[in-house]
Amino acid sequence: AGTTYRASFEELELAEWERQFFANVHFPVFLLQRLVKRIRRGAGVVFTGSLMAVEPHGMSLSYGVTKSAVHALAKNLVKFLAPYGVRVNAVAPGFVDTDWHRTKPAEVRRNIEGKIALGRFCSPEEVAEVYRMLVENSYMNGAVVVADGGYCYR
């Protein structure tokens, strides 16, 4: 789904910035370029964006910017993939209850949960349902679906 690099703006290094763009933007683009002729008509491609591309934060500039690029990619590829009959969308997950998030201190988790209208992290199964919907729904194309439980609306 991508990589992240946490550094202040002043400490950001070009090599890490480029690594983020390679992993989060360049790799999906050129992988899709190699596969597009093998994808059956009517199929859908779903990229993984992020809530951090929608709601800016101060933890990782490169992550937010590259995931914003993924959202733009899903929208812009619509025209390029139309001749192949392939749809393209993206999911922008919020905070998903993964092993990585479970290692966060309880106070940090409570702070995040306090900003989510539903008051909890998304389960992996819940976010998987969003991906499944985008794959199965033959009319969804060029969408970025934010699955964040109402982050910042509480």
Placement of each model-derived feature along the sequence:
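Short, small/polar-rich loop/turn modules that mediate ligand/substrate recognition or access, typified
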Residues: 82, 87, 141-142
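Residue(s) in the substrate-gating loop at a strand-loop-helix junction
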Residues: 50
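Substrate-binding pocket helix/loop in short-chain dehydrogenase/reductase
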Residues: 8-9, 16-21, 101, 108, ...
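Active-site helix of classical SDR
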Residues: 32, 66, 74
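C-terminal substrate-recognition "lid" of short-chain dehydrogenase/reductases
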Residues: 38, 120-147, 152
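Conserved NAD(P)H cofactor-binding loop of Rossmann-fold oxidoreductase domains
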Residues: 1-5, 149-150
